[in-house]
Amino acid sequence: MTTIEQTTVDEVVRGGIARGVAAIGLAGTALIHLLVLPGELSETPYIFFLFLALMVSSLALAGVLIRTGDARVWAAATVLAALVIVAYVLSRTTGLPQSTDYVGHWNDPLGMASLFVEGSVVTLGSTVLFARWVRSAAGAHAGNARASQPRGLQDPTGA
């Protein structure tokens, strides 16, 4: 196996592992919110429906991430997890409309698990997206450098 083939195999394996870990994190988000869902319908119905939407979105994104590593899917998963973190922080600081019971309640075990899982998805998604951005910027820079060289001096391998 050549170095280029090995590099391609390594990238595919790393990409598959990253997508799998992110999918597990998104499924974890859905599970954590399923566990707190029953009490929300009677207390704050809009939060109940937001949790349902979050669970469906998380599972849908997890399913899509298993099949593809498209940057738009990574961005959606990263933004969704970040929004959940923002909502959690707001619920513990200022409170949410019709829901101030959790203000100052930072040591909730499911809340901590949620922050860990969503923080992991945000970190992983941001890392994947940043690495792709760096590679595309480097590729564009290399393409511009080749285009600016006199025709006879261009690298025939395309590197």
Spans of model-derived segments:
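Membrane-interface extramembranous regions
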Residues: 2-159
